[in-house]
Amino acid sequence: GPMFSGHTPFDASGMIVAFEYVSGRKREVQPADCLGLVLVWTRTRGPLNVLQLVFGLTYTNLSVYLRFGIRLFVETFRHDPLASVRIPSAETIETFKDAFAVRHPLLNDCWATMDGLKLYLQQSGNCEIQERYYNGWTHDHYVTSVFCFCPDGTIPIAFFNVPGSVHDSQVAEFGNIYNRLEEVYLSTGAKCCVDSAFGNVTREYLYKSCQDLLGSNAPTREERLLDLQKKRQATSARQTAEWGMRGLQSSFPRLKDRFVYEERGERRITLKMLVLIYNMRARMVGINQIRNTYMPHLNRDANNDVQF
C-alpha cells in the first residue's frame, strides 16, 4: 500500500523515487497486482509473453512494474523478522544443535550446513568481463552464491552474486561468512557442516564431511572407528544443504533461467528478494524438507493431540 502509492517507477532519471499524485490520472495497477506479478514471475520461466496476457500489460509496462515490485519487496521485508537473513539467538542455536544430535549423535554441536550454488549467466561481449564469470570445470558462465541452512529450513547467512570463476571457499572468505561462523562458535560452541570445497586449512568451527579428524593417527582401533562414524554422519548431515538448494530452486523456477548480463545491480536485488521470500515461506508455510526431517514437531497439529 503506502510504499507502492508513495513511489513511482516513471521518473525521468530511471530511479524509483518518492512521489505524490496531486493531479492527472491515477495508476490503474494496484499494489496487489504488482505483488502478484512479482510472485508469478518467480514461479515461471522463459519470456514474459504469458504474463502480458495474464496481467493485461504491454511489455514495457510489465517490465517497469516488475522491476518496481522487486525493489519494493526488498525494501519492505529486508528487516522483517519473518523474512530477514539473520543469525538466530543463542537459545535458538541450542535447539538447532539438539535437532542435529537426534539424527547424528556424534555431531551434537552442529547447528547449520553450508554449500555453494552456481546460477547460469549470459556471456558478456567483453572478453575480460566474460573471463570473470567463466567456470573452466563446467565450461559455462555463472554467478556463484554461498548459503547456510538451519534445521528449520531458513537461511541465516548468505553471500551471493559473485563471479562464477570464484571458488566457494573464496566466496565465503569475501562474504565474511567464515568470520560470522567463528563468532557463533566462540559464543555458543556450535559448528557448521560443510564439504571439502571450503578451505584447505583446518577450521575448528567447521565440520568437513571428508575431514580426516584422526585417521591413522588415532592410537586405538576404537578411536579410528569413531572417527570414521563421525565422518559418515557429517556426510549425511551435509545433505541438508543439498535439500536447501533444491528447495530454493524448485520454489523459484526463475532461478533456473539464464540471468541477463548487466551491471546495474538487477541480479543482486533479484537474488536478495528470492532469499527473503524463501525465508518467509520457510517460517510461515513450513513446507520444507529440512524442517520436516529435523524439526517435525514444528508441523504438529494441535487438533491431533487434543481428544474431544
Question: What role is predicted for each listed range?
Answer:
Residues 1-30, 287-292:
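Basic, low-complexity segments
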Residues 31-44:
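Short, amphipathic alpha-helical "recognition" segments used to contact nucleic acids or chromatin
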Residues 31, 47-308:
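Short, well-ordered secondary-structure "scaffold" segments embedded in the functional core
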